[in-house]
């Protein structure tokens, strides 16, 4: 039996992909943002309950018993260490790895564009990202709405004040009762409603920036000083596809450590394995992270949309099934 050896993307699509990646690099070069390169493996990893990592083991000299390592889901932690060391504004296009879905919009190994702008808040970063999207997607200016506005407009329920019963009632309307009824975690329920009920209804003509996520979904973002119910976090959607996730970056080491510990406690409650906390990152925050905003963007999805493709395999040479 002959193995399926050919790339799933045409050579012409790969040429166009290369041009778009070159355009992205030029975009940042023109703005004086430094390109960096950080490890694909780490001793620590993300604690987020919704992210699943690949693990490997180093068995070289001095590690006869083996040393567990994680493939990075994002270069974020290493890039923040560079920021704390005085790098200034930085970006990179890195391979990221998530042990999750494989399908039309997902590949376990993918290309991520991540950048950090010193002195920016998340609104200024949204402005810059809007410029990049217009360049690559040839689209109009993005629309913007708060997380609360998106829920109220599309689903008619407030994500910040609505009760669990109200949220489950909306889920029933969407035909999601089997999943929603037994769910006890508010954020998991909100994410279900957002992914099924909201994502497909926004950002159809131009990209949509959704910001002011619930504080309980802050991750590595600051809590909004004017409204502690929400975090200075945004996500970007276009034609039903999530493209990016950005933060006005949290710079308080104790608060960040507490969030990591809370994630791991929740992991234990859910029967998941707690993840090793990145104390190098905590030490970098203690040293002093400059005020900044950062965002991670899925390059493969961006290129797929730019070239009018409907499957990520069309712009990826060797996706997971034939890698």
UniProtKB/Swiss-Prot annotation:
Alphabetical list of PROSITE patterns matching this protein: AA_TRNA_LIGASE_II
GO BP of this protein: lysyl-tRNA aminoacylation
Enzyme Commission identifier(s): 6.3.2.-
GO molecular function, one term: acid-ammonia (or amide) ligase activity
One of the record's GO cellular component terms: cytosol
UniProt keyword annotation of Ligase present: yes
Keyword terms, alphabetized: ATP-binding, Ligase, Nucleotide-binding
Record's catalysed reaction(s): D-beta-lysine + L-lysyl-[protein] + ATP = N(6)-((3R)-3,6-diaminohexanoyl)-L-lysyl-[protein] + AMP + diphosphate + H(+)
Binding sites annotated in the UniProt record for substrate: 74-76, 116, 249
Annotated residues for binding of ATP: 98-100, 107, 242-243, 298
InterPro entries according to UniProt: Aa-tRNA-synt_II, aa-tRNA-synth_II, aa-tRNA-synth_II/BPL/LPL, EpmA, Lys-tRNA-synth_II_C
Pfam families: tRNA-synt_2
Top EC class of this enzyme: ligase
Oligomer and partners: Homodimer.
UniProt xrefs under HAMAP family: EF_P_modif_A
Known role: With EpmB is involved in the beta-lysylation step of the post-translational modification of translation elongation factor P (EF-P). Catalyzes the ATP-dependent activation of (R)-beta-lysine produced by EpmB, forming a lysyl-adenylate, from which the beta-lysyl moiety is then transferred to the epsilon-amino group of a conserved specific lysine residue in EF-P.
Similarity comment: family membership: Belongs to the class-II aminoacyl-tRNA synthetase family. EpmA subfamily.
Protein name as annotated: Elongation factor P--(R)-beta-lysine ligase
Species this chain originates from: Vibrio vulnificus (strain YJ016)
Name of the coding gene: epmA
């Amino acid at each position: 039996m002959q193995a399926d050896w050919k790339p799933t993307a045409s050579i012409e699509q790969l040429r166009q992909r290369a041009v778009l990646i070159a355009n992205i690099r030029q975009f940042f070069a023109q703005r004086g943002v430094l390109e960096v390169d950080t490890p694909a493996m780490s001793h620590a990893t993300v604690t987020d309950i919704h992210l699943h990592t690949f693990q490997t083991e180093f068995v070289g000299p001095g590690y006869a018993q083996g040393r567990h390592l994680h493939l990075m889901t994002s270069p974020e932690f290493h890039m923040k260490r560079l920021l704390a060391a005085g790098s200034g504004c930085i970006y990179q296009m890195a391979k990221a790895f998530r042990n999750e879905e494989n399908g039309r919009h997902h590949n376990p190994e993918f290309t991520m564009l991540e950048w950090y702008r010193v002195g920016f808040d998340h609104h200024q970063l949204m402005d810059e990202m809007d410029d990049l999207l217009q360049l690559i997607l040839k689209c109009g200016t993005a629309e913007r709405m708060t997380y609360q506005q998106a829920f109220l407009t599309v689903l008619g329920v407030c994500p910040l004040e609505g009760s669990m019963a109200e949220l489950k009632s909306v889920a029933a309307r969407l035909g999601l009762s089997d999943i929603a009824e037994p769910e006890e975690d508010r954020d998991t329920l909100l994410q279900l409603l957002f992914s099924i009920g909201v994502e497909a209804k926004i950002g159809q003509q131009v990209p949509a920036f959704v910001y002011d996520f619930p504080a309980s979904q802050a991750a590595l973002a600051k809590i909004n000083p004017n409204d502690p119910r929400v975090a200075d976090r945004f996500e970007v959607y276009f034609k039903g596809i999530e493209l990016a996730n950005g933060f006005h970056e949290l710079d308080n080491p104790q608060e960040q450590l507490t969030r990591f510990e809370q994630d791991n406690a929740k992991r234990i409650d859910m029967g998941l394995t707690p993840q090793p906390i990145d104390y190098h990152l905590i030490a970098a925050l203690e040293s002093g992270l400059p005020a900044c905003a950062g965002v991670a963007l899925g390059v493969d999805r961006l290129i797929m949309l730019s070239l009018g493709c409907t499957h990520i395999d069309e712009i990826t040479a060797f996706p997971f099934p034939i890698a």
